[in-house]
């Protein structure tokens, strides 16, 4: 846990991590292209929890900057994400420019299909708010990511290269 001082009190902030994984019926290179292309593909498999998705600069892979709102657990928050590709073709990250949140998409080949994992890590809140965050955020985000992954699988099946 991370400990920060605030007005002579200590506030403990836990590192939060939420992940979901799903098999996608398409080759890893195709799936990664869908994930990395923020203009032509990625917006088409975002679940309803995401709104107002737009690309501010770039569009495909590293250097792309996106902005969107996400509603989770009754709260809506705006994100401005910068995309990086620590392992191009396999791992793509989105780092929020206004917080510690980092979402990682990992695409691994499995025969003619792929295993896709979405994980988000961030510094959780302290105090009573942090307690509720630790109780509810993982369940809510995991459900959103499971929906996104199912939509990605359906999108990949629908747009299967001929």
Residue ranges and their predicted role:
Residues 53-102, 110, 115, 147-162:
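Glycine-rich portal/gate segments that line the openings of hydrophobic small-molecule binding cavities
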